């Protein structure tokens, strides 16, 4: 059982996924800091000095922190857009390289027989022209 798990865990896809999750988590922290520490204070300044993180409604003992929700939504959209742009660039590079490979692959490669047949055809044309 342990051997099977080890083989599964060391497969390329699982390791790649783990690296992606770790990098994604770090990227999320960077974007969260960008939103919380740079963008939201500027947006709050433009809207008259509003600090979104402190916005809330109180219903008795319950507190609804809708300001934090607004920050989280902005955070989500920035992360989503960043990932979208990153994937779009990667796909463009991937498909550009793929098209170049296809062009190389579609270049006609003649077999030995085809080359010989073309030589025979050319020789027959020359013989006809000389008569």
Swiss-Prot record:
Its main location: membrane. Keywords: Cell membrane, Ion channel, Ion transport, Membrane, Transmembrane, Transmembrane helix, Transport. The chain crosses the membrane at residues 8-28, 30-50, 67-87. One of its GO terms (molecular function) is mechanosensitive monoatomic ion channel activity. It comes from the Bacteria. One of its GO terms (cellular component) is plasma membrane. InterPro entries: Mechanosensitive_channel_CS (IPR019823), MS_channel (IPR001185), MSC/AndL (IPR037673), MscL_channel (IPR036019). It is found in: Cell membrane. The keyword Transcription regulation does not apply. The keyword Ion transport applies. It is a multi-pass membrane protein. HAMAP family: MscL. Belongs to the MscL family. Channel that opens in response to stretch forces in the membrane lipid bilayer. May participate in the regulation of osmotic pressure changes within the cell. Homopentamer. This is Large-conductance mechanosensitive channel.
């Amino acid at each position: 059982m342990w051997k099977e798990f080890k083989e599964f865990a060391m497969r390329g896809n699982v390791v790649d996924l783990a690296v992606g999750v770790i990098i994604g988590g770090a990227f999320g922290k960077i974007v969260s800091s960008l939103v919380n520490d740079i963008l939201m204070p500027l947006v709050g300044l433009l809207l008259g000095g509003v600090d979104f993180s402190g916005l809330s409604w109180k219903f008795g003992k319950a507190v609804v922190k809708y300001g934090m929700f607004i920050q989280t939504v902005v955070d989500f959209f920035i992360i989503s857009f960043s990932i979208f742009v990153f994937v779009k660039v990667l796909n463009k590079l991937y498909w550009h390289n793929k098209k170049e490979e296809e062009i190389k692959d579609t270049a006609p490669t003649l077999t030995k027989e085809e080359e010989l047949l073309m030589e025979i055809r050319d020789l027959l044309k020359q013989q006809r022209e000389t008569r």
